[in-house]
Curated annotation (Swiss-Prot):
GO terms for biological process: methylation; secondary metabolite biosynthetic process. The lineage of its organism: Eukaryota, Fungi, Dikarya, Ascomycota, Pezizomycotina. This is N-methyltransferase nanE. S-adenosyl-L-methionine binds at residues 238-239, 261, 290-291. GO terms for molecular function: O-methyltransferase activity. The keyword Acetylation does not apply.
Amino acid sequence: MTIANTPAELLASSISTLASRYAEKVQAGENADTEIASIVSACKDLDALVTPPESWNDRMAMSYTISTAIALLLNWDVFQILAAQAKPTSLETLATSCGCSKSLLRCALREAVAHRMLDELSPETYALNSRSSCLLDENKAAWIHYLTDIGLVTAAYLPKYVKSINGKIPEHSHRIALQMAFNVDETFYEFLHRKDPKRGVNFDKAMQRHIKGDAQASIESVFDFSILRPGAVVVDVGGGKGHHCIRIAKKHPHLSFIIQDYEANGPSDGEDTLPEALARRVRWQRHNFHHKQPMDGADVYLLSNILMDNTVSDCNRILTNIVDAMVPNHSVLLVDDAIDTLSEDSHSAYSSSMNLHMLSCFGTLFRTQEDWLMLFSEVAGGKLSIVSSWMIDAGRMIFALRRKF
């Protein structure tokens, strides 16, 4: 008599097979993203299958505790202390270095160990692992700190916010979860850079983590800036510290760049002094993109991760201001932004999480392809037309648009 395998055994067998495929691809130097996603999904299924429903629900509802623990450990510089020790470190030593009580630190450390953020090599003796070692990078740590600070606080107000809008996101500016959480009237960026500059500095560092990430394709990898005429002007609207323009300017010495932002404070960290030849071609201009675009007739206007932070009505205003400055059938508008592909791939879970984060901080969601097409068609009486588009990275789209008339 053959005994059928239980669902748990079938899943375990599937995980074993997938793990073998993963190992083979890694050894062959091939991309194993598909296998990684499948293994993670199958392990989650197995976890859910063998965990009692009440225990599972408790764990899901209390998932904020790891965010809290990471925030505490970052605030106490625990990861840097462990790195400086260069060996497994006792709770007693860590508590002395942090200046906090052992009982409080123990609580945070246990949570980190339970979620595989730290290793406990012997009772109350801790060490970094590959995951926590990533947080020794200042920019990567800043991103995680942002998520466990502003992200966690604003998320707590999301149910209240959604109730206030009756479950329907307005297309116009309105009071959002971030403003409720911190009791402010300012928008996200105004709050960070004017009301809470310390958090603003941390956020700027966090954004460098994304911009400098090796996995992120650059905009110049899909749009050929070399075809532009000598002396052509590229205007980066909302360009912040100028990460994109400085990078492109180094590759294309025949172009000039204007970086527009609220503060227009100059180069990013690590670029405090631009080489003279580069500095002659790159300048900053104070500009609020909700107002009239001061640079008429530029060859290229760049909007990178700007529209995702704004409601439909605000996006329409931002785009109209640029369209009014464009030369018909000449100027190019490059929109580099997030897109919701509505797929069921491994990216969709992260996209769903970030969608809730966007809703908390900006009162918006990632747009689908249909949403983007609708938005562009409604700008300035239909003056914009898409001439090219590229899907790059997971959940990221670049549109090239021209003014028709």
